[in-house]
Amino acid sequence: MGFVFTTRSRVIPFPMSKPLLHFTHGNSYPSGSYGRLLDDLRRDFDVRTTDMLGHDPRFPVRDNWHTLIDELIAQLETYGRPAILVGHSLGGAVSMLAAHRRPDLARCVVMLDSPVVAGWRAWVWRIAKLLGLRMRLSPGNVAQRRRNVWPSRAAAFEHFMAKPVFQAWAPGALDDYLDHGLVPQPDGVRLRFDRDVEAAIYSTLPHDMDRVLRDPFPVPVGFIAGTDSTELRQAGLDGTRRLVGDNLVTIAGTHLYPMEKPALTAQLTREMIARLLAQGEEKKAGRPAALFA
């Protein structure tokens, strides 16, 4: 047996088996790209991952990400017990939407800088889709044209390290991305994450998230926001605040803070999970409960 503190500092026993945590990645970043964050979380959790959303032919990308939600739910159903859901960007949003559809599969949800597009922004985005402007007004247009082939891994490393966004990553984080994001081909290496899938995901960002905000969310949900996240400013925080209430904390960093500060991200994620699980147990039983039971 092990021990854990409740919210009232009362020590109670819990089984030594680690709580089940499922992590879902952001668009264009296979789950292995988050190696440093996930290794840190593995100290306390049984971490499972979705490798690359949108690449299973059974779940082709469709509008409002409904098939990506189906894909995640299909994986969660194999566990036989509810999991703690954590996801970055795309992954956090899909995790939240999966938990909304199937709350029996989730203990709580932690969203890492994920888009919750609601209100007037959702209406503008819906109209843009109807007018055929989705590719022009999303990063999908850039994704389709981005370079994805290099003569060697070293050349790919030099390419990414020349960009300020990757220079801000923690030591070793770019190696994780290349180790899990490249595959060999006859003339060098290429990105595993298909550019067309990436573009399709961007251009099908849900415009219907207001539906999940109408009633109290069925499981506890929290949000960790990057203070310098351009993507979060574009999506807005109004919908996020309606969704998570007081369960919102910030971290100094951009949208890619899980790669910039993996250790701090893991720490804040642990703290948020503890808060959310306690809220869930108190709601069910009317008493404080083990944070990592």
Residue ranges and their predicted role:
Residues 17-59, 81:
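Conserved HGGG/HGGXW glycine-rich cap/lid loop of the alpha/beta-hydrolase fold
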Residues 22-26, 88, 225:
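The conserved beta1-alpha1 loop
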Residues 48, 52-86, 116, 125-128, ...:
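Active-site loop/oxyanion-hole signature of alpha/beta-hydrolase fold enzymes
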Residues 82-124:
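Conserved hydrolase catalytic core segment
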Residues 108-149, 233:
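Flexible "cap/lid" loop of the alpha/beta hydrolase fold
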Residues 144-203:
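Conserved alpha/beta-hydrolase catalytic His-Asp/Glu region
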Residues 172, 182-241, 252:
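Conserved serine/cysteine hydrolase catalytic core
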Residues 253-266:
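Catalytic histidine-centered segment of alpha/beta-hydrolase-like enzymes
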